[in-house]
């Protein structure tokens, strides 16, 4: 089972992810907590230095930080070299003009998802909790498959056109065939990713807070994911001020702390109602987490 937690920065994704992972580990399930957030705040929450390979936290819980940027750069460098090889004999072709096109958004996110997929297929863990970077990075990751597929198909079409040019001779033909094969394999894995994200074995959860910015970001993200066919399972609203009751609220006039708390409690009520309506309209589950 994969739990993918996402939401805007500062809403408590890492705290929720760590709590989720610890819960399953305490239930006796072998659990892996993975963070793709560049800030790597998981280290701070768990108070353990976490590296790029699974680090043992408890008997049933491992954790790791992932940074797929280096792997993505290495792969794209290979792509660039092969494109230069294919196009080098074309009159007027600038071998460096393709460099920027090769570094399109989403490749590092693709390799991050590749790592998650590999751990899921290995069956070393029953539960994987994926603490993602803020929403923008996550959306780029979720849309990366289509962007990468489009990019790969452009390269393959380019190869076909070049092969049809009269008198054109490929350099490093055997290497070119290998890179084309690798591109085609990536297309196949992209299809697997999309099926995986929509499967019952994945729970994509939006973490939010009861504020205007928090609600708007959550609603936009939900709408976007629905548009690309990625189902959201639940919305987790964090930092809720609980109802402390009449005895506490009665001290508002004489206790500044009570007054501030009651003010925040009152401000949050309308947003909690909006979240409630949002999950009802979209048949989702709503989970509320209080600040105390």
Residue ranges and their predicted role:
Residues 193-292:
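C-terminal lobe/tail of nucleotide-utilizing enzymes
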């Amino acid at each position: 089972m994969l739990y993918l937690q996402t939401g805007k920065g500062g809403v408590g994704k890492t705290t929720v992810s760590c709590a989720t992972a610890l819960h399953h580990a305490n239930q006796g399930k072998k659990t892996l907590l993975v963070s793709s957030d560049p800030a790597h705040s998981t280290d701070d929450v768990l108070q353990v230095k976490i590296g790029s390979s699974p680090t043992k936290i408890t008997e049933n819980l491992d954790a790791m930080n992932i940074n797929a940027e280096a792997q993505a750069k290495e792969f794209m460098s290979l792509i660039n070299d092969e494109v230069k090889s294919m196009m080098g004999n074309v009159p007027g072709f600038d071998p460096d003009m393709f460099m920027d096109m090769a570094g399109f958004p989403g490749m590092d996110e693709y390799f991050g998802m590749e790592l998650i997929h590999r751990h899921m297929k290995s069956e070393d863990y029953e539960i994987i909790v994926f603490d993602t970077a803020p929403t923008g990075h996550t959306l780029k990751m979720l849309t990366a498959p289509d962007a990468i597929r489009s990019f790969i198909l452009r390269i393959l079409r380019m190869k076909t056109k070049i092969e049809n040019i009269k008198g054109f001779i490929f350099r490093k033909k055997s290497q070119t065939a290998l890179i084309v094969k690798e591109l085609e394999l990536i297309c196949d894995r992209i299809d697997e990713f999309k099926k995986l994200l929509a499967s019952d074995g994945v729970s994509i959860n939006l973490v939010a807070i009861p504020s205007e910015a928090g609600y708007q970001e959550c609603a936009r993200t939900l709408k976007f994911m629905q548009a690309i066919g990625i189902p959201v399972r639940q919305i987790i609203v964090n930092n809720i001020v609980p109802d402390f009751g009449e005895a506490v609220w009665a001290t508002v006039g004489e206790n500044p702390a009570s007054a501030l708390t009651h003010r925040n409690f009152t401000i949050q009520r309308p947003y909690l109602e909006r979240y409630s309506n949002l999950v009802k309209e979209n048949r989702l589950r709503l989970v509320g987490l209080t600040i105390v």
